[in-house]
Amino acid sequence: GTTTERMLDDVATEFPRINDSIQGRRAAFGYHPRVAKRADLMFDGLIKYAFGDSSAKAVETWNAPAGWFVGEASFAPNETKRSEDDGFLVTFGTNAREQQSAAFVIDAKTMQLASTVHLPQRISLGFHSYWCPGF
């Protein structure tokens, strides 16, 4: 096959992810942390892009709570796997002012917050993650 490169839109993003179970095949959706407008390389939300044959468009956005910045999102597929975007995005977030951290779980289909897990210790911004299903 061939690989092509094109601009998705004029919003700055980094660390794009897809549902890892389709790695190596054409993805219908991608999930990108959005660079905050008032902070250098800090991410204030996630954007879901739908990839068409010749275009891509942002279809949904999840905004982190005010004062929080997040990192790269890992895709955790739903065991029923009805569609490529049937699963959850898991991203770590940090509120530096409050010295708090949390794991945010976002429904990948609707981009709505499903759960917040508050962590007992603050973690650094830029923390990467990878979803590993249990055995």
What are these regions (language model features)?
Residues G1-F135:
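Beta-propeller domains
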